């Protein structure tokens, strides 16, 4: 999961930040305003066509609250949630046709709760469960028609 956070930070640096205020991302992944103060507020980045690319909430330079990613078409791609820079809450991903393809839950930076994966047609393919980053409960796998094909119990 650290890799996802680093990827997001790298992505924002490479993409060239464009927002309502000049925001700079330092080598630690903290966001600063043009006066080099830790930034609090909403950060928005846009595609060259003017559509939003990403919108996130920051508190004292750290991602805190909702993060929304968009496809270049302007359609929503993913909603994430952070608490003090750590993954926390429900993350939902949609494909370009607007079909929900994933729902995941985190708590204090770790996988926690129910996870669901759907195919591009909206058919449930996987149901998984985590507690504090560990696999728990009954995991299920479904075929392309939605028929249960496998179950694995994790203690």
Q: Language-model segments: what does each one mean?
A:
Residues 1-24:
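Bacterial Sec-dependent N-terminal signal peptides
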């Amino acid at each position: 999961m650290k890799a996802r956070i680093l990827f997001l930070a790298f992505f924002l640096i490479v993409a060239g930040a464009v927002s309502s205020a000049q925001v700079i991302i330092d080598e630690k992944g903290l966001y600063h305003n043009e006066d080099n103060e830790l930034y609090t507020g909403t950060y928005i980045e846009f595609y060259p066509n003017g559509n939003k690319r990403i919108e996130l909430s920051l508190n004292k330079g750290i991602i805190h609250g909702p993060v929304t990613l968009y496809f270049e078409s302007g359609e929503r791609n993913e909603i994430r949630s952070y608490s003090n820079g750590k993954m926390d809450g429900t993350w939902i991903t949609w494909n370009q046709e607007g079909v929900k393809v994933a729902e995941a839950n985190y708590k204090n930076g770790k996988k926690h709760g129910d996870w669901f994966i759907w195919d591009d047609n909206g058919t449930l393919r996987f149901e998984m469960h985590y507690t504090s980053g560990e696999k728990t409960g009954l995991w299920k796998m479904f075929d392309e028609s939605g028929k249960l094909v496998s179950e694995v119990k994790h203690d």
